[in-house]
A protein has these predicted regions:
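Phosphate-binding site recognition
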Residues: 11-429
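Single conserved hydrophobic/aromatic residue that forms the stacking wall/gate
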Residues: 1-10, 431-440
């Protein structure tokens, strides 16, 4: 694998856009930024972890990489830091739960998903008639996997919060999901002696009566500086791995190298997960931009945050606050169905990020992470708060820009007056700024 990777011409580099399986990525010669030294540190310094990151930030690939590592697949790590760090390459039984593959609109939908997962495991390790609940079956599976293999079990959970996110606004359904998942994950505590390692990932962290409230040994590394680079791409990693491509991309854009790097930073950098962390680039948008050699709102093209709009409307949130929101760590890190603020969901979903920190009062200053998110989110919101539909919205914005560039200020102000006449107060005075630097 390492030889194949070295032989690949840079111009033939295949970007792993949408590739979430580590084995496929390595065998098929996809480009990979080596995160395995951090993964090794993670595995060797603890046992139970939780990590929240925005969607399309590499969480599923992280889980898949951990799976390959605990399966002892040394050949997949040739040429990576892990090859030299790990000496034993022990194979462990792995229980992998992926909750990202289903729509959850009823208590039965979650129970059905968990049941299908358990059935798959029970075909490998057996079952007992007395295990008459999902949580008891999970406990039994962990116990038998340990006894039959002689190795403690690895638990990997991808997108643990998908059911909870889909139930935002439905208190009864969210409580049902919470109780089901809390009981299910409770097996991790009761079978602690049988477990080697557990990693749970998601977009959000739900507070109050959390699904993890019984797991007092679960380390939430979402705001730990030492693991900031575990998901996403840092500027240092870009220059180390993509320096030639940076110059090629700049040439295609007919820009100087320095001005191009600054534009790339403005569009896709800016995610801060602690008050003093380095900025991280959105990997999905960044790799798409390198593949196509053009700037675009790639993250927004993959899905729109409709649940966020419902939150904003239900809480009558004044969007003017969004570009300079302030909150504390307790609010920032927990979400529940009765919350009076949409900010935790917006932050944890990646539409806001940490811009500053007031150490005296423990207050975080939030804002849009970058230009892609700011422009995409505002453009996405316009149809929900005005009479324009999704098709009209981008064309109206283009008309604003063209009228300014051509000096047709009368048409511009007439259109602006009409726009705000159809706009609710919540968005009328919001941070709807035209990119004036691009107009002249």
């Amino acid at each position: 694998i390492a030889r194949r990777q070295r032989q690949m011409c840079i111009r033939d580099r295949i970007y792993p856009i949408g590739i979430q399986n580590f084995e496929s990525l390595r065998l098929d010669g996809y480009f990979y930024i080596d995160k395995t030294a951090l993964i090794y540190q993670l595995v060797k310094s603890g046992r139970y972890y939780f990590l929240s990151r925005p969607r399309r930030f590499g969480k599923s690939l992280l889980i898949s990489t951990l799976e390959a590592y605990f399966q002892g697949k040394k050949e997949l790590f040739q040429g990576l830091a892990m090859e030299k760090l790990e000496k034993d390459w022990t194979k462990y039984p792995i229980l992998h739960i992926d909750l990202n593959t289903q729509k959850y609109d009823s208590p039965q939908s979650l129970e059905s998903k968990l049941n299908r997962t358990l059935v798959t495991w029970e075909k490998l390790y057996g079952s007992e008639p007395a295990e008459d609940s999902l949580s008891m079956r999970f406990e039994g599976t962990i116990q038998r996997a340990y006894e039959q293999t002689g190795q403690r079990v690895v638990i990997l959970v991808d997108e643990y919060d998908k059911p909870m996110l889909q139930a935002i606004g439905n208190k009864e359904l969210q409580n049902s999901f919470r109780e089901t998942l809390k009981a299910f994950y409770g097996a991790l505590k009761s079978k602690d002696g049988c477990i080697k390692f557990a990693m749970l990932t998601g977009v959000t962290k739900f507070g109050k009566v959390s699904v993890f409230s019984d797991l007092n040994n679960l380390d939430d590394i979402s705001m730990w500086n030492e693991y900031i680079e575990l998901c996403g791409i840092s500027e240092k990693e870009i220059h180390k791995n993509l320096e030639t491509e940076l110059h090629e991309f700049a040439d295609v854009q007919k820009m100087t190298y320095d001005s191009f790097c600054e534009k790339l930073r403005q569009y896709y950098d800016g995610y801060h997960f602690t008050h003093n962390s380095i900025g991280m680039y959105n990997p999905f948008s960044l790799l798409n931009a390198f593949k196509r050699k053009e700037f675009g709102s790639y993250w927004f093209e993959t899905g729109t945050p409709t649940y966020l709009v419902e939150l904003l409307k239900r809480h009558h949130y004044n969007l003017e606050r969004m570009a300079h929101e302030e909150t504390n760590a307790q609010v920032l890190n927990s979400i529940d169905s009765e919350s009076t603020s949409p900010i935790p969901v917006i932050y944890q979903s990646g539409y806001l990020t940490i811009k500053g920190y007031d150490e005296e009062f423990g207050i975080y200053h939030l804002g849009f992470p970058n230009k892609e998110v700011e422009e995409g989110f505002i453009q996405f919101l316009v149809p929900y708060y005005t009479s324009m539909n999704n098709v009209e919205s981008p064309f109206e914005i283009q008309k604003f820009v063209r009228e300014i560039r051509s000096g047709d200020y009368n048409s511009f102000f007439q259109r602006l007056q009409s726009f705000f006449a159809d706009t609710t107060y919540a968005v009328s005075y919001a941070h709807l700024t035209l990119p004036t630097s691009d107009l002249v």
